[in-house]
Regions:
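Helix-to-beta-strand junctions that scaffold the AdoMet/dcAdoMet cofactor pocket
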Residues: 263-264
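Adenosine-nucleotide cofactor-binding segment
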Residues: 176-182, 194-258
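NAD(P)H dinucleotide-binding glycine-rich loop of Rossmann-like/cofactor-binding domains
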Residues: 59-66, 71, 99-180
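Hydrophobic/small residue at the entry helix of a nucleotide-binding pocket
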Residues: 161, 185, 209
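Glycine-rich beta-strand-centered segment in the early N-terminal region that forms part
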Residues: 20-34, 49-103, 145-147
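Glycine-centered, small-residue-biased loops immediately flanking beta-strands
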Residues: 267-268
Length: 325
């Protein structure tokens, strides 16, 4: 079968590789669609990062480059391994693409996403969505309604990143949120916030991203910091109070500074983006306003709720697809 394989920085090859073996406890999936994540681009341009370099196998998967890429994908079940009796052939599914040690608990309340040596299918080994077929442990396979188009279903993985950021924030319906950055994660996070009943303000410079935010309907207000003073506008919108919660989705320090200034006293700031460079923060403001600054990474037991929001029609993923290849 065909697969996109990462060899090294700037070196991804389309190759013929053997089809995966569907072993006991796994599910064979024929891949329908796979998204290209910002992480994939970083691996190509700056990697290997998550991908274990050639000759340095990942401690859990035992694999190193070349690695089959792709972790945002949907597909149709074509085979089930021995012991799998709750998924049928022909079922539409998405994958929560974790690689964790076999002794790591993965039930409700378990923080398996923070476990030692955690990695992702499509980065750390075990196949990937940029291939024709993949075999995945049953635990990580999530059935979805056949009513969800499979191209849209491929976005459930990054949507779950947004859902976990929302959970980490502790926000509730009726709150006002400021999202700093309208890239894919910022937009999908905003879709989650709207579905959960929050008022959403987005700050973004890019004309294309502002247009996508408008087109998708995920923001009540879209502020361009090159045109307006974002903090002043936020204060007008919130009657001088500031927002209840803010989400940093840009890896840009000026955006983080804006969020610190725009959040109300005792408010929450969630750092969603992965920074590849040092950041600074106005600690005096954090202290004097008693702000709560939190990190978030990926997702943990978020997929079921995310899938439910899409199945119930509370989130439409179609506007977030920019191109199909």
């Amino acid at each position: 079968m065909k697969a996109a394989r990462f060899y090294d920085r700037g070196d991804i090859r389309i190759e013929d590789i053997p089809e995966p073996e569907v072993t006991p406890g796994t599910v064979g999936i024929k891949v329908a669609w796979c998204g290209i994540c910002g992480t994939d681009l970083h691996e190509f341009m700056e990697g290997p990062i998550f991908i274990p370099p050639c000759g340095h196998p990942h401690p859990i998967s035992g694999e190193s480059a070349p690695i089959t890429m792709g972790h945002e994908f949907s597909g149709v079940v074509y085979a089930v391994g021995e012991g799998v009796d709750d998924i049928e052939i022909g079922q539409h599914v998405v994958v929560e693409p974790y690689i964790v040690a076999d002794d790591v608990p993965t039930g409700p309340g378990d923080n398996y996403h923070l476990s030692k040596n955690m990695n992702f299918i499509g980065l750390g080994g075990r196949g990937g969505g940029l291939s024709e077929k993949i075999a995945v442990k049953r635990r990580w396979v999530h059935p979805i309604s056949n009513k969800i188009p499979l191209d849209q279903a491929a976005l459930i993985e990054p949507l779950s990143v947004g859902h976990h950021a929302y959970v980490r924030s502790g926000a509730k319906a009726g709150d006002i949120a400021l999202v700093g950055g309208a890239g894919p994660i910022g937009l999908l996070l905003s879709a989650i916030l709207k579905a959960k009943g929050l008022k959403v303000i987005i700050t973004e410079l890019s004309a294309k991203r502002k247009e996508k935010a408008k087109e998708s309907g995920v923001a009540d207000y879209i502020l361009d910091p090159s045109e307006v003073d974002v903090v002043s506008e936020v204060m007008k919108i919130t009657n001088g109070d500031g927002v209840d919660v803010a989400f940093e989705c840009s890896s840009v320090n000026k955006v983080l500074d804006t969020l610190v200034a725009a959040v109300k006293p005792t408010g929450v700031i969630v750092i969603v983006s992965i920074w590849s460079h040092p950041a600074s923060i106005n600690v005096h403001s954090v202290v004097m306003k008693e702000l709560d600054v939190r990190g978030t990474i990926a997702y943990v037991n978020d997929h079921e709720e995310t899938i439910k929001l899409v199945e119930e029609g509370k989130i439409n993923l179609e506007p977030f697809i920019t191109q199909r290849i």
